[in-house]
């Protein structure tokens, strides 16, 4: 957007305008950089699988101009995509049933072709001023439904990180990172979902309800995977 471009210009950065579906613009932008950080994704969840495939193409396009250069390419993914009955670690992989695996697969493909490509997995809560992520989604759901909710006892846990700490993790990955790595940018590692729902309940002055999985699908809809 123009507003975002102005913010970057004020910091002394040069703005290059591109589009996730304009692969030539992505190639041109990546070719002109000493390092590339990819954080863009179309969050229209009504077209989630389609958008995941578009992200695959975007990653492969940018990677194609970085082959053999050793210039770092950091691609953003998510910790919430990993499923395990224990705290997840960097060596865990995205499930085959998750369309978002397309991004991880693209990183592995271009790394095999000679690109210094790494994954930065962000937790479901990247919080701080200007938060546009999952917590605002939960707050809006509670406003719309008239209550905050968790599934069963809400003892599933979310990781979290402040947005400035996440930015620092990207910088360190560029400046000091090793070749073809996976990073988890985590500040707080074990926040019970029930505690998040309770805070939303208190903040909005609405009830807090425990839902069964079937009830949760009606309440959270596409977000159920992340709330479970």
Can you describe what each PLM-predicted range is?
Residues 101, 127-137, 144-145, 172-183, ...:
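Glycine/proline-rich active-site loop of Rossmann-fold NAD(P)-dependent oxidoreductases
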Residues 105-129, 134:
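Conserved beta-loop-beta element that borders a ligand/cofactor-binding pocket
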Residues 123-157, 163:
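NAD(P)-dependent short-chain dehydrogenase/reductase
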Residues 114, 139-151, 206-211, 215:
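A short C-terminal helix-loop "cap" of Rossmann-like NAD(P)-dependent dehydrogenase/epimerase domains
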Residues 2-60, 64:
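NAD(P)H-binding glycine-rich loop region in Rossmannoid oxidoreductase-like domains
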Residues 42, 54-99:
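Conserved Rossmann-fold NAD(P)-dependent oxidoreductase catalytic core, especially the SDR/UDP-sugar
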Residues 167-225:
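Mid/C-terminal beta-alpha module of Rossmann-like enzyme folds, strongest
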